């Protein structure tokens, strides 16, 4: 179980049509507010723009991965995600 301390939080929107990353370049953790785990393709904090996305499963609730970008996927229509750091 993850219990991070989050001071800033927001909604991850439009993931079906465009990649998500914070405009200020901050890295973040992902909260899955859906009812089931979801597989996302992400770039982790230490990865560069040239690196390929990696696929990983995000459980319901806050997840420990520190992410810099999430890849868009048209199948994520019923996924509810939040970012926080």
Regions found by a protein language model. Name each.
Residues 1-85:
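Surface-exposed, low-hydrophobicity beta-strand/loop segments enriched in small/polar/acidic residues
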